[in-house]
Amino acid sequence: MKILLAALTSSFMLVGCTPRIEVAAPKEPITINMNVKIEHEIIIKADKDVEELLETRSDLF
């Protein structure tokens, strides 16, 4: 009887010591700061005839 009582007591103590993992959402929202600088350049190459047309007819663009 004492052995059974000791076994039950020790098993209850061991069950109480098992690790528990808890996953919970954070209280504050997650913020991601991205400092991105985007630069682009458009290069247009035109023939001389097209350049003259663009100079004379500036209303095209």
UniProtKB/Swiss-Prot annotation:
InterPro entries: YnbE-like. It comes from the Bacteria. Pfam families: Lipoprotein_19. Coiled coil: none annotated. Keywords: Cell outer membrane, Lipoprotein, Membrane, Palmitate, Signal. A lipid is attached at C17 (N-palmitoyl cysteine). Residues 1-16 form the signal peptide. It is a lipid-anchor. Disruption phenotype: The deletion mutant does not show any growth or outer membrane permeability defects. A lipid is attached at C17 (S-diacylglycerol cysteine). It is found in: Cell outer membrane. Forms multimers. Interacts with the C-terminal region of the probable phospholipid transport protein YdbH. Involved in outer membrane lipid homeostasis. Interacts with the inner membrane protein YdbH to form a functional protein bridge connecting the inner and outer membranes of the cell. Is required for YdbH's function and may facilitate phospholipid transport through the periplasm. Belongs to the lipoprotein YnbE family. This is Outer membrane lipoprotein YnbE. It comes from Escherichia coli (strain K12).
